[in-house]
Amino acid sequence: EMTQERMAVILEEPIYAAKDWSAEIVPDATIDDLDEVAIAKARMMFKKVHSRIPAEEVNAWNVQTFLSKCGLTRNGGITRAAIILLGKYESAFKLRPAVVQVTWTRRDKNQEVVDYEHFTVPFILTVDEILSKIENLTLREMPGGTLFPDTMKQYDDYTIREALHNC
């Protein structure tokens, strides 16, 4: 049986004691470390997600304001998440010793590697390239009462993208 003292200690423990690694500021990073094409795509996606904010308003924000609204800067500093999502290739080295890379690997029936490719920042642009490499078979099912099969992908693209973003 648990004592009242032990119960009190457990209940007073912080729920999220660990720091968010991706939210930490990269000390020597600047806006110049970010890819302009990646920022443009992020801005376009932001306008889709936040459609209640007029597009003209979002377009009028300077890069620093936009990154702040996205939560990719903290107190004006560029976060690790900003480098991972929007950074130029050479900016990834500012995150060392972390290796900012996803490796796609194709294996044969004996699990021998027959092909591979490395992908790196900016992941907002490369995630679609990675997705295109993943074998996602089209499944066909014959429902009753029809001559035409229903088709669906083996894996939902949204789910795969979510897993890639969480990498």
What residue ranges belong to the model's regions?
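Conserved N-terminal catalytic/coupling substructures associated with nucleotide/phosphate chemistry
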Residues: E1-C167
